[in-house]
Amino acid sequence: MQAPWAGNRGWAGTREEVRDMSEHVTRSQSSERGNDQESSQPVGPVIVQQPTEEKRQEEEPPTDNQGIAPSGEIKNEGAPAVQGTDVEAFQQELALLKIEDAPGDGPDVREGTLPTFDPTKVLEAGEGQL
């Protein structure tokens, strides 16, 4: 006798049939482990409850607003700014790095249009030759 779910992908079955199948799977898996006890894992869907907004606010530590002025501007207390010719040199070096690291053709590739390849002409030319 063929199982009711075999060959029918849309079969949902009754709750009892689904529960029975789940118990069968749980028992067969536990017996494969050499464990005759029922699995302590729940059979069926598990619903994870998300914390409510009030609980999230209680759990989150207060954020530290260092570096942000009351006006909303961010204070720059990090590394000193690069000025003058150093900026230009840095930009040139960065541009060179981007060019060198860019994927694609190397310096030995010539620009131009490649000839088109027609496989039917190749076959015609090679038909009489062995």
Swiss-Prot record:
Span list, region Disordered: 1-88, 101-130
Signal peptide: none
Similarity comment: Belongs to the GAGE family.
Entry annotated with the keyword ATP-binding: no
Organism: Homo sapiens (Human)
Residue positions where Phosphothreonine is found in the record: 113, 116
Listed InterPro entries: GAGE (IPR031320), GAGE_fam (IPR008625)
Protein name: P antigen family member 5
